[in-house]
């Protein structure tokens, strides 16, 4: 017999490496789709104004507003709406968790 002993060892754990790769790929996908602008941009083949703006030269003048907002709309309205919905949801959940119970007094004449 040989003096070399074979010990049983568990297989290497690759879960942390797989988790790191999955997080990296997920972050790359989210960044790619959040930073790419897919809407058609106004303008001509030389002057592109995808986020609105103005351009003026000797022969032409271009004025485009932002594609998401008109000239009279506020940019804070969606944020305020989200906060209002969250607040209403929390209010309803608080009311559901703490229902109003009638007050019972210890007075025998009041019951």
Curated annotation (Swiss-Prot):
Main location: host cell
Coiled-coil annotated residue ranges, if any: none
Keyword Transport: yes
Keywords recorded for this protein, A-Z: Host endoplasmic reticulum, Host membrane, Membrane, Transmembrane, Transmembrane helix, Transport, Viral movement protein
Localization (cell): Host endoplasmic reticulum membrane
Lumenal membrane side: 38-72
Assigned protein family: Belongs to the Tymovirales TGBp2 protein family.
Protein name (record): Movement protein TGB2
Annotated organism of origin: Papaya mosaic potexvirus
């Amino acid at each position: 017999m040989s003096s070399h002993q074979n010990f049983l060892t568990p297989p290497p754990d690759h879960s942390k490496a797989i988790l790191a790769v999955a997080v990296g790929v997920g972050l790359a996908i989210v960044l790619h789709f959040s930073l790419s602008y897919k809407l058609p941009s106004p303008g001509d083949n030389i002057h592109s104004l995808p986020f609105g703006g103005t351009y003026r030269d000797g022969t032409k003048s271009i004025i485009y507003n932002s594609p998401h907002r008109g000239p009279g709309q506020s940019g804070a309205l969606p944020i305020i709406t989200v906060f209002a919905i969250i607040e209403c949801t929390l209010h309803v959940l608080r009311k559901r968790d703490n229902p109003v119970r009638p007050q019972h007094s210890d007075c025998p004449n009041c019951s």
